[in-house]
Amino acid sequence: MTGKLDRETLSTLVLSRTGAPNPDLLAGPAFGEDAAAIRVGDETLIASTDPISLAAERIGQLAVAVASNDVAASGGRPEFLLSTVLLPDADPDRLDTITAQLDAESERLGLTVAGGHTEVVAGLDRPLCSLTCVGLADRYVSTGGARPGDRVLLTKGAGIEATGVLATDFRDRLDLSATDLDRAVTAFDDLSVMPEAAVLAPVATGMHDPTEGGVLGGLVEMALTADVTVAVDRDAVHVRPETRAACDAVDVDPLRVLGSGALLATVDADDAEGMLETLDDEGIDAVEIGRVERGEPAVAIDYERHTEPIRDGMYALWD
């Protein structure tokens, strides 16, 4: 079944097998954590790797955003990328499209593609693109740093990545006007969280960029890794009109679908208002959507408690 491994399998077969220990590894592989923190002299290097295996039409652009977001959400300043592109055939037009997207998005975000690997692989039915991103950080910020009393902030809105994917890979399923469809496609230009992460990193107790499972899935990962309850007001979670329309067309919940473009952050209650004002000054939409409480690891929303990872609603469209 499409999607992330369950926690038990991940823990048993992946997270327990990490090779030789190294004292310079400050933060290694763990559930819900998307980047490693490595001591390099007096500096902290943040490194992350992430594949794009389902979305097809904007795979190169999406890959750059997803990989760099993981570094930014961990407090790093994304700088270099390593790119692996696997193709089902040697179609030069397909490769041209992917590498042009990688090049354009990297240049737009100020990132350098420093190396990588490209080959044709028998048995694939679509291209795969996996990027590794690295950058230095003044302060590492984990997914699981939330503390009781913190406030939960969300930038931009839910389902931004899903909006773009639906408007390209699944446009034939959307009953949208040409204007609304064009607006939905522009979601791909709003996927980077580097600007807001730079604002929040100095004070955030935890940060996470929601991807699979959407904003709700990201919140669950923050709650489980921090061993806290996160109480969320669904009505406070911003959903753009084009996102709502696209999700309604395929009957998926905007809070449970591909969420790149949003950044979740927990901050001390005394810092929340100031951070929202600073983000607004930078032209970044952000709202407070909840609070962190003592209790079993869970997300409380809509009179329900979510204690397990969320399966992304988009997966059913590919399965």
Predicted regions and their residues:
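General beta-strand structural signal in soluble alpha/beta enzymes
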Residues: 27-29, 47-48, 113-116, 154-156, ...
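Small-aliphatic-rich amphipathic alpha-helix that forms the alpha element of a beta-alpha
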Residues: 56-81, 98-111, 195-199, 215-221
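Short, acidic (Asp/Glu-rich) active-site segment that either coordinates a divalent metal cofactor
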Residues: 142-197
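Helix N-cap motif at beta-to-alpha junctions
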Residues: 266-272
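Active-site-proximal betaalpha loop/short-helix elements
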Residues: 90, 184-259
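Glycine-rich anion-binding loops of enzyme active sites
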Residues: 77-166
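Acidic, Ser/Thr/Pro-rich beta/coil linker or hinge segments at domain junctions
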Residues: 279-319
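Extreme N-terminal cap/leader segments of soluble proteins
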Residues: 1-55, 105-106, 110, 313-319
